[in-house]
């Protein structure tokens, strides 16, 4: 039986490339000359450093524009609160969402069951497996989920025939 998985994960290679491009632009921009503005990446966290709140906003704008150019959906990012560190400097931790949350997976299963399409949906850890008899049914489920779930970026992978 054909099946696929519904997941929520960013392309980490593109995220890393966007961070490197952001750091390169920040180091060459005139308004950041002499400041300690930078963006760091560890595991599923991005940390933006700047001299003040205004420059932190500028750093985040650069980062988000680079991510958009590299086709990384900014809905993957969960912005934390701005923290003061030594002197006037500030930082902000931005977490990268990974996996489909419990509430969202239940919502996806409910949407699939309510759609009356002949497929089954089952929650498997941080993914939702959709199984159906025909490939056309699976494609209609993908179209329906793209239309109905707009608050979280969904990826569809692990297609089996």
From Swiss-Prot:
InterPro entries documented for this protein: DUF520, UPF0234_N, YajQ-like_sf
GO molecular function ontology, one term from the record: nucleotide binding
Keywords tagged on the record: Nucleotide-binding
GO cellular component: cytosol
Superkingdom classification of source: Bacteria
Family matches, as NCBIfam families: PRK05412.1
Role of this protein: Nucleotide-binding protein.
Entry similarity comment: Belongs to the YajQ family.
Protein name: Nucleotide-binding protein Bphyt_3208
Protein species of origin: Paraburkholderia phytofirmans (strain DSM 17436 / LMG 22146 / PsJN)
Source organism phylogeny: Bacteria, Pseudomonadati, Pseudomonadota, Betaproteobacteria, Burkholderiales
């Amino acid at each position: 039986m054909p099946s696929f998985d519904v997941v929520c994960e960013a392309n980490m290679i593109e995220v890393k490339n966007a961070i490197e491009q952001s750091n390169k632009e920040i180091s060459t921009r005139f308004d950041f000359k002499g400041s300690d503005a930078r963006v760091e990446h560890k595991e599923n966290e991005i940390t933006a450093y700047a001299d003040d709140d205004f420059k932190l906003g500028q750093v985040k704008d650069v980062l988000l524009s680079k991510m958009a150019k590299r086709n990384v959906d900014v809905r993957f990012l969960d912005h934390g609160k701005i923290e003061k560190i030594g002197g006037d400097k500030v930082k902000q931790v931005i977490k990268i969402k990974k996996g489909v949350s419990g509430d969202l997976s239940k919502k996806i299963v409910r949407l699939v069951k309510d759609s009356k399409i002949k497929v089954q949906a089952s929650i498997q850890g941080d993914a939702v497996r959709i199984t159906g008899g025909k490939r056309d049914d699976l494609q209609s489920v993908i179209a329906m989920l793209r239309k109905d779930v707009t608050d979280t970026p969904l990826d569809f992978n692990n297609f089996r025939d």
